[in-house]
Design a protein with these regions (language model features):
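Class I SAM-dependent methyltransferase SAM/SAH-binding core
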Residues: 56-106
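Short alpha-helix
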Residues: 185-203, 209
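Conserved class I S-adenosyl-L-methionine
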Residues: 1-43, 56-60, 77-80, 102, 146-174, ...
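A short acidic, Gly/Pro-enriched loop at the edge of an enzyme's catalytic core
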Residues: 108-117
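A short glycine-rich, Lys/Arg-flanked "PGG" loop and its adjoining helix->strand segment in the class I
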Residues: 131-146
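A short SAM/SAH-binding and catalytic strip from SAM-dependent methyltransferases
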Residues: 117-129
Length: 275
C-alpha cells in the first residue's frame, strides 16, 4: 500500500480538544462493550489498533491482558498515548508496543497473519478508497481472527442534520456517501450492506453489527459528562438501542464485527485404480 493523506490531520486538534466529552465517551464506551462480547480475556490475543490515536481502546485491551500494537501517523496523538500509558501499572505498559506509521503502509510494517484482532475504528471514513486498507486488514488478520470496523453510517446521513433542523442539509444528505464531520473534515460514509460485502470478498464474514450513538449524536460537541448516575443511564439506553432494530439502523456510526475465515485444507483427489 502507498502512503495516503487521509485528511484527518486537518481536524486533529479539534479531535483532541473533544476527548472526554459526552459524545466521545459514549462512542468509546459502546465500542468497548460491543467488542468485549466477542473477545474474551483468555487466551491473550495479539491485537493491532490501526489509527490508535490517544490509545483509549488499546489501553482497555492491554488492561485485560492482551498484547497490543498501536499504529498511528500522528506524533501528537502518540505522545498523548504515551502519557496515558505512563499512568497505568507497569504490566499494562509492558503489553503495548507503539509504531509511528501510515495506515496506508500496514503490509510494509507487519507480517501476514500476525494478529488475532485488528481494530479499525473511525479510520475508514478518511480513505477515499477503502479497498486497499481492507485488503491489508485481511492480510494481517490470522484465520479465525476478529476485525472490529467502526464507520460512519451511510444509510442514515440525513438523520443528524434533520434532527438539528437543518432541512436543506438533510435533503442533500439523501443518496450522498460523504459528509463534513464535527471536526471540520470532509469524510466518507459506508453503507452496511456494501461494507459487509467488501469484507466478505476479503474472507472476513460479519458475525454481528451494532449502532453507536443513536440518541446522543446531536448533542453539542462540547457537552461535558453529566453526573455518574445519568451517564450510566445514557450508556444503558445507547447500548440497548445499538443492538436493537430499528434504532441501530439510524445510528450515526456502525460497528461491524467480522471473523477471518479459517483456512480450508486442500482436498487431494483420490488416485485412480490401475487399469
Amino acid at each position: 500500500m502507498d502512503s495516503v493523506d487521509t485528511g484527518f490531520s486537518a481536524g486533529e486538534e479539534q479531535w483532541r480538544a473533544r476527548l472526554g466529552t459526552l459524545r466521545e465517551v459514549v462512542r468509546q464506551d459502546l465500542v468497548s462493550r460491543q467488542l468485549a462480547a466477542h473477545l474474551p480475556d483468555l487466551p491473550p490475543r495479539r491485537v493491532l489498533d490501526v489509527g490508535c490515536g490517544q490509545g483509549t481502546q488499546a489501553l482497555r485491551l492491554a488492561r485485560r491482558g492482551h498484547q497490543v500494537t498501536g499504529v498511528d501517523a500522528s506524533t501528537r496523538l502518540l505522545d498523548d498515548f504515551r502519557a496515558a500509558m505512563a499512568a497505568e501499572p507497569a504490566e499494562v505498559g509492558d503489553r503495548v508496543r507503539l509504531v509511528q506509521g501510515d495506515a496506508g503502509q500496514l503490509t510494509d510494517l507487519f507480517a501476514a497473519s500476525s494478529f488475532d484482532v485488528v481494530l479499525c475504528q473511525g479510520v475508514l471514513m478518511y480513505f477515499p478508497d477503502p479497498g486497499p486498507l481492507l485488503d491489508a486488514i485481511g492480510h494481517l488478520l490470522a484465520p479465525g481472527g476478529i476485525a472490529s470496523v467502526l464507520v460512519r453510517n451511510g444509510d442514515a446521513l440525513a438523520m443528524r442534520p434533520g434532527l438539528l433542523g437543518d432541512w436543506d442539509e438533510a435533503e442533500k444528505a439523501f443518496g450522498e456517501d460523504s459528509y463534513r464531520n464535527r471536526i471540520g473534515v470532509h469524510a466518507r460514509a459506508d453503507r452496511r450492506a456494501d461494507l459487509t460485502a467488501a469484507l466478505a470478498r476479503r474472507e472476513m464474514d460479519v458475525r454481528e453489527w451494532y449502532g453507536v450513538r443513536v440518541f446522543t449524536d446531536t448533542v453539542a460537541s462540547s457537552t461535558e459528562l453529566p453526573d455518574e448516575e445519568t451517564l450510566q443511564a445514557i450508556l444503558r439506553a445507547e447500548e440497548r438501542a445499538g443492538r436493537t432494530d430499528p434504532y441501530r439502523q439510524v445510528a450515526a456510526l456502525l460497528h461491524l464485527i467480522a471473523v477471518r475465515r479459517e483456512e480450508t485444507p486442500t482436498r487431494r483427489t483420490p488416485e485412480q485404480p490401475p487399469s
